Swiss-Prot record:
Protein name as annotated: Transcriptional regulator UL34
Region described as Disordered: 268-330
Compositional bias (Basic and acidic residues): 287-301
Acidic residues bias spans: 273-286
Family of this protein: Belongs to the HHV-5 UL34 protein family.
Primary subcellular site in the record, as a coarse category: host cell
Keyword terms: Host nucleus
Biased composition (Basic residues): 302-312
Organism field: Human cytomegalovirus (strain Merlin) (HHV-5)
Subcellular location: Host nucleus
Length: 407
């Protein structure tokens, strides 16, 4: 005989279910408002309606568009986009995918076990910021590399995958919205869900709107982290502490900023010295205070002789190492650009036409010596070195005819 055992929840506490239903209802109502708008421009206006005006007005096009990232992080990936735009290389989409997946943010996810509600909020915000930065990078690829067919097709497909409620960003956004109290953060929930309903065309064309979103999300997320009791020095990387404290000062959290400034000043001052050393230092200060000022510089006196510079021959010179040079994100584009720079070109329209003709003449001379002998070499050199009529007219001196005198 088979027994079927069923379990039921006989508890009368429905607070958890009601809270979950309320969160689903809030997210569902916001999604219905965007789904009811057919045109992409209407969805964009609905998103702008819930975005406050930034204090500095519209953001610049070349400003940092990554959330919780330094200027150096953003410049590194932006130079990679410029590298793709300059070098017409046969690039593998898998290489772009690897670069996109390496984009993160300076907010660390929490690794504490078991996690507290503040740790869950920190991890959710970190994941949303990382996926938002990857979406922004893909949108910039689509915007700036519009003449590269393969890059455009890859960026269009990636934008379609990364937009929508069923994407990876949509899953993380809904998890973050479930952790927020909707009564206090209704505008933030509306903006987060509104991001998921924007079209790929909007992401590729509205670069300034992305800067507007970045400014709002940074301030809102920083408010959430501070109100949850998290410490800035523990949740952010060390290179982002100064930027985080600057934003805290702008949004009004002056207490933590003053404490951080006092800590930085005490660390810069070093450990206090003994009382005897302090007394000796005070005596030295008194002597310097009462001593006569230093005499002014006399212009008639000969100045100190400068150390002579030693010239190094060209073959012994070493190339200067540029420590601040950014790494190349796409090596294949770098190799293609180097090949294009090394390829000889002939042009008499610009100012370097003579030098390029000399280079071509030298190449033809060596080729003629190998094939036909010295006579053909001289002929080829004479033909190659002959400038164009425009150059000849520019180099020929203008002389007036001389009329003979009759005596």
């Amino acid at each position: 005989m088979n027994f079927i055992i069923t379990t039921r929840d006989f508890s009368n506490d429905d607070s958890v279910l009601r809270a979950a239903e309320m969160r689903d209802n809030v997210a569902g109502s916001i999604s219905k408002a965007y789904k009811g708008t057919v045109r992409a421009e209407g969805k964009k206006k609905l998103l702008l309606k819930h975005l406050p005006v930034p204090p500095g007005g519209c953001s610049r096009r070349n400003s940092n568009l990554f959330v919780f990232c330094t200027e150096r992080d953003y410049r590194k990936f932006h130079q990679g986009i410029a590298q793709l735009k300059r070098a017409p290389a046969e690039l593998d989409p898998h290489e772009i995918q690897q670069v996109t997946a390496s984009i993160r943010c300076r907010l660390q996810p929490s690794l504490r076990e078991p996690p507290t509600p503040a740790d869950e909020l920190q991890t959710a915000v970190s994941r949303v910021c990382a996926l938002f930065n990857q979406l922004v990078f893909t949108a910039q690829l689509r915007h700036y590399c519009e003449h590269q067919d393969k890059v455009v097709s890859y960026a269009r497909d990636e934008l379609t995958k990364r937009c929508g409620e069923k994407s990876a960003l949509g899953v993380e956004v809904h998890q973050l919205v479930a952790l927020l109290p909707h009564e206090r953060h209704r505008e933030l929930c509306h903006v987060l869900i509104g991001l998921l309903h924007q079209t790929p065309h909007m992401w590729a064309r509205s670069i300034r709107l992305i800067g507007h979103l970045r400014h709002y999300l940074q301030n809102s997320f920083l408010h959430l982290l501070m109100n949850s009791g998290l410490d800035i020095a523990q949740v952010f990387d060390g290179c982002y502490h100064s930027e985080a404290y600057r934003m805290l000062f702008q949004i009004g959290h002056t207490d933590s900023v003053s404490a951080a400034l006092e800590l930085s000043h005490s660390a810069a001052a070093g450990p206090p010295e003994a009382d005897e050393n302090n007394d000796e230092g005070e005596e030295d200060d008194d002597e310097l205070r009462h001593s006569d000022p230093a005499p002014l510089h006399d212009s008639k006196k000969p100045r100190n002789a400068r150390r002579p510079r030693t010239r190094v021959p060209p073959h012994e010179q070493k190339p200067e190492e540029n420590e601040e040079e950014e790494e190349e994100l796409f090596p294949s584009c770098k190799a293609t650009a180097a090949f294009l720079r090394a390829e000889p070109s002939v042009s008499n329209d610009d100012g370097n036409g003579g030098e390029r003709c000399d280079t071509l003449a030298t190449a033809l001379r060596h080729r003629a010596d190998e094939e036909d002998g010295p006579l053909a070499s001289q002929t080829s050199v004479r033909v190659a070195a002959t400038p164009s009529p425009s150059v000849t007219s520019a180099l020929t001196p203008v002389t007036s005819p001389i009329t003979p005198l009759c005596i």
